[in-house]
Structures are given as C-alpha cells and as structure tokens.
Amino acid sequence: KETYLSRDFRETAAQCFPSQAKELNAFFDARLNVLLAENADASKEKQYHLKRQILPGIAAYETLQRVMPKEEALQTVHGYVEELARTSHKQLAALLRIPGLYRLVPGVFVKSTRSVFGPAAGFDSKELQVGNGIWRVDMMKCPYHDTCVAYGCPELCCCFCDSDDISYAGLHPKLIWHRTKTLGRG
C-alpha cells in the first residue's frame, strides 16, 4: 500500500533524479519489502506504525543516500514527515475553533495514546498526571526509536518526534503541548 512517504519519495526520485528514478524506485521497493518481511511477526498494533511510517521512512532514507549525502537524505525525509504534520496541524487547529472543543483534547489524547500508542504497539508509557484538563506522560519505550536504532539509523527518529511537535504545538491558546525530551532526540 502506498504511504505518504513512498509517494513523496517517488516524487523526489522523478523530479530530482529522473535518469535514475526507475532504479531508485526498484531499490526502495525491494528494501521496503525486506523490512516488511523482517517485521512480519509484529503485532497488528505495531504494524500500523511500521507500515505507515517507520519502515517506509527507513527505506526512503537508505535509498536517498545512494544519490545524496546522508544529511541531505535525512532532511529530505524530514521534509516529507514535516509536510504531513503541518497539514495535520492545520486540520486540528481548524477543528479546535469550535467553542469549547479544546476541553476534550486531554481526554482524547489519553484514550488514543492508550490504544494506538500502547504496549501492544511497542510503546511503554508512564502516566504522571491525568485529570483536571492535564495529561503528563513519560514515554519509556517507543517502536519508532527502537526500530530506527535496530536498523542503524537512530538519527531518523527525530523526524517522527518533530512531527508530533509540529502537529500539536500551538493548536489552541488554552492547550499547551510541551516536551522536555524524547527518546529519539534525547
């Protein structure tokens, strides 16, 4: 299934490396298939993150390094992730213009984190404070970080950490998104 990362990668290959695009796409597809096969035994919940973002990100990053320096490849993949995050931010901010809706956000975050970002998906969180419109959590384990480290590209994880910050910071004057650290950025 085509993801935003694979779509954006193919666009970069076609626009920036037209004479090599076919070869780059073939390498990307082959690498992604290997990554998917190596992670086929992961839980359904973890597969959601692996297939949608983590593994296509790794495949794009590795493939781009065939035609550009490592740092440029990292910034290119970061750009893909950032673009999606900015779109997400705009949509969420527009939704939160509905009067009073911001009050539901902490509760929604708690529920979605427990399900989509729970232990079955490879996350381990420690809730520090829940209630009275506040939700504080320490993420102790993250499959984005673990997978990037396992495949020798820990620097790629910051793309996904930054994505959260872009998506959620400044959504509403009465909501504060704040991180002190992430597993990927330290």
Roles of regions detected by a PLM:
Residues K1-L64:
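N-terminal, charged low-complexity regulatory/assembly segments
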Residues E45, H49, V108-V110, A120-G122, ...:
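Sparse, context-dependent recognition of short Cys/His-centered cofactor- or disulfide-binding micro-motifs
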Residues R52, P56, E62-Y151:
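Amphipathic interaction/junction segments at domain boundaries or subunit interfaces
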Residues G118-P119, G184-G186:
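A short catalytic or substrate-binding loop motif that flags glycine-/basic-rich loops and adjacent residues
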